[in-house]
């Protein structure tokens, strides 16, 4: 089930990293979490918090709330493995411990976690969500935080050769996202 898949992903990422995190330091293994809260039609639901990622090799619906943050949803339609991240900033300051709060870390960690859970890298498809400019004061500013988050996500996916098959980005309103890990279906509602 999802908990076993999560444990396998965490073990793989610990081995791949080859280092033990210091106290308070985040690793990909530490942010692949399972937050079950109900089932709908026999499919478990999970809520994804900002700065985390979620991967499942069994059917699951993952929801999150986005403003200027971005979520990249990845899925392998053949292996029926999918996952979602939720990052807040395009990148962290220099000399900052790696964290899924940053797009430059969260997107590669999500790719690695999906491959560890059984997805084939060449079969991965992406959907990108979020990146709104929700603060009125910044709406006239070119290159607002939401736009930068979207740009980072798209650049990494392009560099990794992962096609973006759908997106709902930018704008002035937040979004509620629900993503199904097993088939890549996604629903977005403006807030």
Predicted regions and their residues:
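Conserved mixed alpha/beta catalytic, RNA-binding, or beta-rich assembly cores of soluble enzyme
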Residues: 62-117
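Short acidic-glycine loop/turn motifs at beta-strand connectors
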Residues: 57, 76-80, 180-183
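Phosphate/ribose-phosphate-bearing ligand recognition and processing surfaces
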Residues: 135-147
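Phosphate-centric recognition/catalysis
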Residues: 27-40, 44-64
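Conserved active-site and cofactor/substrate-binding residues in soluble primary-metabolism enzymes
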Residues: 48, 79, 101-105, 109, ...
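Divalent-metal-activated hydrolytic enzyme cores
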Residues: 146-191
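Extreme N-terminal basic, low-complexity initiation segments
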Residues: 2-8
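Short glycine-rich phosphate-binding loop at a beta-alpha junction
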Residues: 123-130
